[in-house]
Swiss-Prot record:
Species, as recorded: Desulfatibacillum aliphaticivorans
Protein's pathway: One-carbon metabolism; tetrahydrofolate interconversion; Amino-acid biosynthesis; glycine biosynthesis; glycine from L-serine: step 1/1
Cofactor: pyridoxal 5'-phosphate
Name of the protein this chain belongs to: Serine hydroxymethyltransferase
Residues at the site labelled Plays an important role in substrate specificity: H227
Gene name in the database record: glyA
Record EC number: 2.1.2.1
Length: 413
């Protein structure tokens, strides 16, 4: 990382970057949506591709001099199609939210009815939250999980679809630890005449490696981010096998975006090449093994998990029986060198600013090379701190353990 060049021009910015690197190096990152991009991915993002405007698509640009950015975008598209067995890939969305927006504008009209997962049950802001553009422009009806099991209530989903006749059903989540039944969702969509869109932002890396069923054979359109489990640059992508390519492309450009971020697209190409390797598949297998081990050890320590465990890379801790809120827990474990995020749990009695849960995931710590023995240690540290929030000596000793662990598994070593 070339901090010296930045330091010569802007020491304040360089210091912030250096401090962030230090934070990442010496804390345990358990936020499920975060990961560690490779040096190659970061180098591509910092390349001369950032200098080039390239409105349009490869072979059909509104600017000259695009022959080499065309190569980069075609590499990204072709590799994405190979990775996910898709006929169509659009790698231009700046984010997962904009990928979702592009799909909505391609398939819907303002005011159309859409069925999406409730944010408080594990959905996402762009799945119809009233504070999001999605909830303001479209008429979202929400389905959720069963209170007893914490798993998606497909009977409720089918009933709501039959009652409201949505034009689109949105599946996928930001805080759901179980495998999603895509064949059942497709069946419900076909029964009710709806399109099916799957937002696989959280599980894309698992899907690419065969560690989670793929939505591509079932959904009309699939969206994703390119970071999270996919371990690429921050960005979005749209995939489809159902012939919607022309509509989707026109709604990204010129519909909601102008010039694509060619340096990020080049980094996406690099990340997708990495994702096509056996090493990436082994990494994703370890992500899932680590999550299962971490979940089991937490439950052995008396920590309640929503749905009783995990099938993917994340778990949702229900802190109700520990007499601590999600907000308090987030701050508490951060003192011990562990980063998590507060998160609502299904049927939460606290609001989203406080919450009764925290979300935990294994992508970043697995990228550092940690395996099951480290998961047991991390679970013990996390559970001990959560159960003894007033024990400052315990917090300090845990922070020391965390620092030792991080030094044994450095990032960018």
């Amino acid at each position: 990382m070339d901090l010296e060049t930045i330091r010569k021009v802007d020491p304040e910015a360089a210091k912030a970057i250096e401090q962030e690197l230090d934070r990442q190096q010496f804390t345990l990152e358990l936020i499920a949506s975060e990961n560690i991009a490779s040096p190659a991915v970061m180098a591509a993002q910092g390349s001369v591709m950032t200098n080039k405007y390239a409105e349009g698509y490869p072979g059909h640009r509104y600017y000259g001099g695009c022959e080499f950015v065309d190569v980069a975008e075609n590499l990204a598209r072709d590799r994405a199609k190979e990775l996910f067995q898709a006929d169509y890939a659009n790698v231009q969305p700046h984010s997962g939210s904009q990928a979702n927006m592009g799909v909505y504008f391609a398939l819907l009209e303002p005011g159309d009815t859409v069925l999406g997962m409730d944010l408080s049950h594990g959905g996402h802001l762009t799945h119809g939250s009233p504070v999001s553009f999605s909830g303001r422009i479209f008429n979202f009806i929400h389905y959720g999980v069963k209170e007893k099991t914490g798993t998606i209530d497909y009977d409720q989903l089918r009933s709501l679809a039959k009652e409201h006749k949505p034009k689109l059903i949105v599946a996928g989540a930001s805080a759901y630890p179980r495998i999603i039944d895509f064949p059942e969702l497709e069946k419900i969509a076909r029964e009710t005449g709806a399109y099916l869109m799957v937002d696989m932002a959280h599980i894309a890396g698992l899907v690419a490696a065969g560690e989670h069923p793929s939505p591509l054979p079932y959904a009309d359109v699939v969206t994703t981010t390119t970071h999270k489990t996919l371990r690429g640059p921050r960005g979005g992508m749209i995939l489809s096998n159902k012939g919607f390519g022309k509509k989707l492309s026109s709604q990204i450009f010129p519909g909601i975006q102008g010039g694509p971020l060619m340096h990020v697209i080049a980094a996406k190409a690099v990340a997708f090449k990495e994702a096509l390797t056996p090493e990436f598949k082994a990494y994703q297998q370890q992500v899932v093994k680590n999550a299962a081990c971490l979940a089991k050890r937490l439950m052995d320590n008396g920590v309640d998990l929503v749905s009783g465990g995990t099938d993917n890379h994340m778990m949702l801790l229900n802190l109700s029986n520990l007499d601590i809120t999600g907000k308090e827990a987030e701050g508490l474990v951060e003192q011990a060198g562990i980063t998590v995020n507060k998160n609502t749990i299904p049927f939460d009695k606290n609001g989203p600013a406080v919450t009764s849960g925290i979300r935990v995931g294994t992508p970043t710590i697995t990228s550092r090379g940690m395996k099951e023995p480290e998961m047991e240690l991390i679970a013990d540290c996390l559970a001990n701190v959560l159960k003894n929030p007033q024990d400052q000596a315990l917090i300090e000793s845990t922070r020391a353990k965390v620092k030792d662990l991080c030094q044994s598994f450095p990032i960018y070593a």
